[in-house]
Every structure is written in C-alpha cells, then in structure tokens.
Amino acid sequence: MTIKIGINGFGRIGRMVFRAAIANFKDIEVVAINDLLEPDYLAYMLKYDSVHGRFDGEVSVDGNTLVVNGKKIRLTAVKDPAELKWGEVGADVVVESTGIFLTKEGAQKHIDAGAKKVIMSAPSKDDTPMFVYGVNHGTYKGEAIISNASCTTNCLAPVAKVLNDKWGIKRGLMTTVHAATATQKTVDGPSNKDWRGGRGILENIIPSSTGAAKAVGVVIPQLNKKLTGMSFRVPTSDVSVVDLTVELEKAASYDEICAEMKAQSQGALKGVLGYTEDKVVATDFRGDARTSIFDAEAGIALDGTFIKVVSWYDNEWGYSNKVLEMARVVAK
C-alpha cells in the first residue's frame, strides 16, 4: 500500500521529510506541498542544500506543479489549512511543519480539508498526544492528530527508556548542545521574548530553554516530573548532542550501562538507537537516520547511581525519518 503524504510548510523539516521519503521510504509518496513561497523558489530550495548537499534526482516546475523524478506534486500557497482540499489529492497523512498549527484546533483544519491524519513536526502546544517512534509508538490508538515531539526529545527518550527500564531513573538533568536553527540570527538583532536568542550565532554559544526533557515525561509517563533540561545553541549548521545526567534507583557500572545500550541498539530499538565506541565528532552523524546514537566513549560515572550519558542526533535528517516512520504507524 502506498501512503500518500501532504506537507504543509516546506522549511528545513518539510524539505528533509520530502528528501527522506524519496531516499528511504518507497511506500510513501508526497502528493502535495503547501508553502507561501513561489514554485520556482521551492524547487531551488529542494535542489540545493547547504547542509545535506544537492538533491539526488530531477526537479522541475510546471506551473503550480512540482515534478520530481517524473512524478507530479501539487503546489499551493494557501494561508488557511481549511482551504487546502487534501481530499482532492487523497492525502492519508499531512505533515504539519509550519510550526504554526500546533494545537488540535489548528490541525483539525487539515482534517476538515480532507486529510485523514495529521502529524505535527514539533511539540504540540496543548494536550495533543505525543509520540517518539521506538519508545511509545506502540501505544498509538488511532488518533487523527498527533505530535512527533521535538528532535531533542527523539534523542533523549530512547536512552532514558533504556536506563529507566533496567535500573530506574530517580531524577535527571539534560543539556543539549544544539546546532543553530532558523530562529538564530547571523548578527545581533531584536528578539523580544528571548533576548539572548537575538544575539548572533556566528560568534556565540547561546543558552536557551527547551521543553524536550519534560516532554519525555509525556512519552514515558513513569518519568513525569523527573527530568528537566536546557539547551546551548552553538555555531554549527546541523547535528546536536544530548548530555543526560541522572541518579539511578539501582546501582550499575558504566560498562553495564554501555552493554545494555549496545544490546538495545541491536534489538528492540534497532534503527532508532545507535551505539558507537569510536572517537566521533558531530559531522560524523550528518545524514544518520537514527535519532539517538549512544557514545560509549563520551559518558562518565561518579559512582554506581550517578552517571552521565551522551547521545548524538542529526536534528534534521534523523528526526525527519522518524516523522515518516510515524506516518506509517498512523496510516495503518
């Protein structure tokens, strides 16, 4: 069965979802894209990417149609999702990647326009069910509108799950050292809500807030109110790393923790959690479709119950691949 996807918002994640569908998901077909940019410019942005390189395929525009490798994709430039007529293209799932419609009320407009299901490519701003593929996707019960959480939650949740399932997490703090995103400015500029966020990313390490750790408590209810975290935005274009420091309920050696991470990466969490003992750095994970790659050489332990684990993630490519894994789940 071919799953037909619509994409609302052709920014970083929208374009990476499209590329991932072409590269890794032969059962998924993108049938429509909605974005306010001109068709020629959308094609250009798809063809050329400063982080992930040139698109491997043929891209052209015919009026309001994007033609990719001979397949026609409807293009629209509509502000109100209720007017998108997803039913006309048979969209099974709409990926909501504008960052705007992050409530059930907003996403419902896609359903009203004919979409069967909606996946928000960001944490929801209400009680919309949140899923991390590999961690709690098995609890999906047919909801029409879901959130795929954040890229950082997709990295943190698998390692937190392994630790909690085996030894129990009493409490923990997370820091993500996060590549720059579209919210960063190249030079200092106005940012009313987040003054630090308005400083130029080329010259700075910028402390920032993140709800990623608290969101793990939604995805893994046993960890509710046990984790919180913060972020440092750094002058890199892609690939981020989670540093999770926890107090365990039961004692474990660091070697035992590494062994369990390795076992899970080859077992139940294969394709989601990775494991490495190599002397790696950020760019080594660019283009990695897994959302959390445990770095055995980077973590440390103070004693049996106080440990720090480190896990890498391509915050664009890995996350976008898991959006499509969730699309498979909700389309069944």
Swiss-Prot record:
Subcellular location: Cytoplasm
GO cellular component terms listed in the entry, alphabetical order: cytoplasm
Annotated site location: Activates thiol group during catalysis: H178
Domain of life of the organism encoding this protein: Bacteria
GO molecular function, one term: NADP binding
Biological-process GO terms, alphabetical: glucose metabolic process; glycolytic process
Keywords, comma-separated and alphabetical: Cytoplasm, Glycolysis, NAD, Nucleotide-binding, Oxidoreductase
InterPro entries given in the database record: GlycerAld/Erythrose_P_DH, GlycerAld_3-P_DH_AS, GlycerAld_3-P_DH_cat, GlycerAld_3-P_DH_NAD(P)-bd, Glyceraldehyde-3-P_DH_1, NAD(P)-bd_dom_sf
Assembly behavior: Homotetramer.
Primary role: Catalyzes the oxidative phosphorylation of glyceraldehyde 3-phosphate (G3P) to 1,3-bisphosphoglycerate (BPG) using the cofactor NAD. The first reaction step involves the formation of a hemiacetal intermediate between G3P and a cysteine residue, and this hemiacetal intermediate is then oxidized to a thioester, with concomitant reduction of NAD to NADH. The reduced NADH is then exchanged with the second NAD, and the thioester is attacked by a nucleophilic inorganic phosphate to produce BPG.
Protein name: Glyceraldehyde-3-phosphate dehydrogenase
Organism annotation: Ralstonia nicotianae (strain ATCC BAA-1114 / GMI1000)
Name of the gene this protein is made from: gapA
